[in-house]
């Protein structure tokens, strides 16, 4: 298990250059990404996990990675933004594709696992938080687009991206 401390995430300020961003502003959030497979972390205003060799027989609701976040002073709410847009109501954060069988797509969603209240995959990801409190999130596999009942083991490629915004 590889553990990497990720520097503070850069957050979009106000509405400058962002449509419908509301009053979300820059706040530093300490994020610790616990990577359970062979991945390369890359930070670009988001936590982006790029699979290198994910050899697996995927199981529903299996965790791909977890994110631990400590809330700094002055932050009372956090919003998780998936890859597609700032206004999406679902929290799909990406898709992995079997490199030998492109019909086998694994859809991943973010899930809040700890802290005050929980939300499950697909629910809106804006929630209240407490200062100096740690929260844990996980990327979970919730199904794919393969028409048959199972997925074959193999190498899956793609990327999962999630941004954390604070008020």
UniProtKB/Swiss-Prot annotation:
Gene3D superfamilies in the record: 2.60.40.3480
One of the Pfam families matching this protein, by short name: CssAB
One cellular-component annotation, GO: pilus
Cellular compartments annotated: Fimbrium
Residues of the signal peptide: 1-21
Keywords per UniProt: Fimbrium, Signal
Major location category of this protein: other
Key word Cell inner membrane present: no
Protein known as: CS6 fimbrial subunit B
Chain's gene name: cssB
């Amino acid at each position: 298990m590889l553990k990497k401390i990720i520097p503070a995430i850069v957050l979009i300020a106000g509405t400058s250059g962002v449509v419908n961003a509301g009053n979300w502003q820059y706040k530093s959030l300490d994020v610790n990404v616990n990577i359970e497979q062979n991945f390369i972390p890359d930070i670009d205003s988001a936590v982006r996990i790029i699979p290198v060799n994910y050899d697996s027989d995927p199981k529903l609701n299996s965790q791909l990675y977890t994110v631990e976040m400590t809330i700094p002073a002055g932050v009372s709410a956090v919003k998780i933004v998936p890859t597609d847009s700032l206004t999406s109501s679902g929290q799909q954060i990406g898709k992995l594709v079997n490199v030998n069988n492109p019909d086998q797509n694994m859809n991943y969603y973010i899930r809040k696992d700890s802290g005050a209240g929980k939300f499950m995959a697909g629910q809106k990801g804006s929630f209240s938080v407490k200062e100096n409190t740690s929260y844990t999130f996980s990327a979970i596999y919730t199904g794919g687009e393969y028409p048959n009942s199972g997925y074959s083991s193999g190498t899956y490629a793609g990327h999962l991206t999630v941004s954390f915004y604070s008020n």
